[in-house]
């Protein structure tokens, strides 16, 4: 066969990164590589590039920012690209998408408003955008770039009145640049009419205080002449007092700024990134939130949470905290729903479904049953058999069942069990939960007992099943008339746990303690003390007297035979030696340690030395 005409295309950088992303959508480095590769298509995508290259870059930006909407720098790059290839309107559309995705970014609002200043001749539209930005980021401790741009805009418009109003607003906010803004405010206020410096009622009070003071008396020879104040002197005195009022505001803001500087100075990464934050950063955010919550200003608390959730967007604990704090505020339940929705739909990984389950519980609490059910179903679409979601859905069906009819709750459990998408451990837990519905909710004790007994042979490894089975029998009503029957049933379950199950030794020991407490505290038969002491010896005594463990070592043999053989072979009972297994490399102590609940790591010396 002639292979000369066959051409195998070499994988491009773009194809390589795209393939990596398709394989792992959470590979951030691959995403950044794909953006770079897209930007360099055809030697660099620009106005003269092919439509295919331009649309490819747009598509990559859309995909990337859809997954990581908090990357303000990439929104800026996307907007600049659109301005270059399609004009101001297309660029503005990207900025609008950007501030919808990250509405509390000082940098993005500053860039957007600067763009609007240069491309829009309607001052009112630009001013309106600045006002929106001020409401979103104006309280940010590091918002001075935005405020500087806002002041620059009003100066360009030759609106000193607006400049003064902005500065008057700024001197009340604890900011990194608070002192600079106060100095500028003092400077600008000197040229402002006195009527603009304070509210009319405050000015009237100051004027009354000034005019109430006695006039100056000047000596002229032997005469004393009273000099009445003129308006200029009154205004000069009023301005001095107004300055003192503003100075008090400055000192208060200075104190508030100093309080926050303790936390602000510890923020090393104020922007979003997928890299983990170190514990010191997380602790600082927790303490900062504690501080603002104690201060009690609703707007400042909300803004700090939003700042925190830019940096800590991938940490579920802060989403939980924000939602819980907001739920304690009067008339803000809709905001709680929005917080849960943002976390669930964008930021919290599906591999950690806890925030989604909490969202479903919140929706159910508000009567939104269909919404809650849809949340559980969406989790199970991505994580088939997720226990938290399944049990949440079952709980929803149980709580909202008409006339306590649990048909739907059982149907959810059994359909998921029968689908076979769960691992064995999850399936066993779901079977147990199905039985517990019959026991605890429907109250059909006989049916529940039969279900426990029927499933017991298949669930010998399931800790949850056997804990539930034992508790089921322990919690049945006990009185003097049914003691014998009650004890027999509890004892039967305990016998299966100790001799038939394959549970870890620690679990068996814990369940045995429960049974011993039952014997000691709920029995009215003195003879059970013999059983109590026998179990105590068998569970807590030295291994040489634990007869049940001998049986497990050599099942099916007579107890005396096992004891005699082990003693003669090993010098003491308790460890069964098999020469063939030793030669193959298996430690004779392995089973001993396993039954003790200890992992054995010793390798037989014969095998280790290579002897045969």
UniProtKB/Swiss-Prot annotation:
Q: Where are the HAT repeats?
A: 158-191, 367-399
Gene Ontology terms describing biological process: mRNA 5'-splice site recognition; siRNA-mediated pericentric heterochromatin formation
Q: What is its main location?
A: nucleus
Q: Where in the cell is it found?
A: Nucleus
List, alphabetically, the InterPro entries matched. Answer: HAT, TPR-like_helical_dom_sf
Coiled-coil region: none
Q: Which UniProt keywords apply?
A: mRNA processing, mRNA splicing, Nucleus, Repeat
Q: Would you tell me the Gene Ontology cellular component terms?
A: commitment complex; spliceosomal complex; U1 snRNP; U2-type prespliceosome
Disulfide bond residue pairs:
none
Q: Provide an example Pfam family for this protein.
A: HAT_PRP39_C
For this protein, the record's PANTHER family field holds: PRE-MRNA PROCESSING PROTEIN PRP39-RELATED, PRE-MRNA-PROCESSING FACTOR 39
Name the job this protein performs.
Answer: Function prior to stable branch point recognition by the U1 snRNP particle to facilitate or stabilize the U1 snRNP/5'-splice site interaction. Has a direct role in the assembly or function of a catalytically active spliceosome.
Record's family?
A: Belongs to the PRP39 family.
Q: What is this protein called?
A: Pre-mRNA-processing factor 39
Q: Which gene encodes it?
A: prp39
């Amino acid at each position: 066969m002639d292979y000369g005409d066959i051409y195998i295309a070499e994988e491009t950088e773009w194809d390589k990164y795209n393939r990596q992303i398709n394989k792992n959508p959470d590979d951030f480095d691959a995403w950044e590589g794909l953006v770079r590769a897209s930007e360099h298509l055809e030697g660099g995508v620009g106005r003269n590039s092919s439509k295919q290259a331009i649309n490819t870059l747009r598509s990559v930006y859309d995909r990337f920012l859809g997954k990581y909407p908090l990357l303000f720098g990439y929104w800026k790059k996307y907007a600049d690209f659109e301005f270059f290839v399609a004009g101001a309107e297309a660029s503005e559309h990207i900025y609008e998408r950007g501030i919808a995705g990250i509405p509390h970014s000082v940098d993005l609002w500053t860039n957007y408003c600067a763009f609007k200043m240069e491309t829009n001749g309607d001052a009112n539209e630009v001013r309106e955008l600045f006002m929106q930005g001020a409401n979103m980021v104006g309280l940010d401790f590091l918002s001075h770039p935005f405020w500087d741009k806002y002041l620059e805009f009003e100066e360009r418009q030759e609106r000193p009145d607006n400049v003064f109003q902005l500065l008057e607003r700024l001197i009340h906010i604890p900011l990194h640049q608070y002192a600079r803004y106060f100095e500028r405010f003092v400077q600008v206020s000197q040229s402002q009419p006195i009527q603009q410096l304070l509210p009319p009622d405050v000015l009237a009070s100051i004027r009354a205080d000034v005019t109430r003071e006695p006039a100056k008396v000047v000596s002229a020879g032997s005469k004393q002449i009273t000099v009445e104040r003129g308006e200029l002197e009154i205004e000069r005195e009023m301005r001095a007092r107004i300055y003192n009022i503003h100075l008090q505001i400055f000192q208060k803001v200075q104190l508030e700024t100093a309080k926050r500087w303790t936390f602000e100075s510890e923020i090393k990464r104020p922007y979003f990134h997928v890299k983990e934050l170190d514990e010191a950063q997380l602790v600082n955010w927790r303490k900062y939130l504690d501080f603002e919550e104690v201060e009690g200003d609703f707007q400042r608390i909300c803004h700090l949470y939003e700042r925190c959730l830019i940096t800590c967007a991938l940490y579920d604990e802060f989403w939980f905290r924000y939602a819980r704090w907001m739920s304690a505020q009067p008339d803000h339940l809709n905001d709680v729903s929005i917080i849960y929705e943002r976390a669930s739909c964008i930021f919290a990984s599906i591999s950690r479904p806890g925030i989604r389950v909490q969202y479903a519980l919140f929706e159910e609490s508000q009567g939104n049953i269909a919404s809650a059910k849809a949340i559980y179903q969406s989790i199970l679409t991505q994580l088939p058999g997720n226990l938290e979601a399944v049990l949440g859905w079952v709980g929803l069906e149980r709580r909202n069942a008409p006339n306590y009819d649990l048909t739907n709750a059982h149907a959810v459990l059994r359909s998921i069990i029968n689908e076979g998408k769960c691992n064995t451990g999850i399936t066993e837990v779901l079977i147990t939960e199905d039985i517990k519905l019959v026991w605890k909710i429907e109250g059909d004790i006989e049916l529940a007992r039969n279900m426990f007994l029927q499933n017991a042979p298949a669930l010998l490894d399931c800790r949850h099943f056997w804990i539930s089975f034992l508790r089921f029998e322990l919690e049945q009503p006990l009185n003097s008339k049914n003691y014998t029957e009650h004890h027999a049933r509890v004892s039967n379950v305990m016998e299966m746990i100790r001799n038939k199950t394959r549970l870890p030794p620690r679990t068996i020991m814990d369940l045995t303690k429960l049974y011993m407490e039952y014997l000691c505290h709920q029995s009215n038969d003195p003879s059970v003390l013999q059983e109590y002491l026998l179990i105590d010896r068998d569970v807590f005594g030295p291994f040489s007297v634990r007869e049940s463990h001998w049986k497990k070592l050599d099942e099916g043999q007579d107890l005396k035979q096992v004891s005699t053989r082990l003693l003669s072979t090993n010098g003491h009972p308790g460890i069964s030696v098999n020469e063939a297994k030793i030669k193959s490399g298996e430690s004779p102590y392995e089973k001993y340690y396993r039954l003790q609940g200890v992992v054995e790591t010793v390798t037989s010396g014969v095998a280790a030395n290579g002897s045969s």
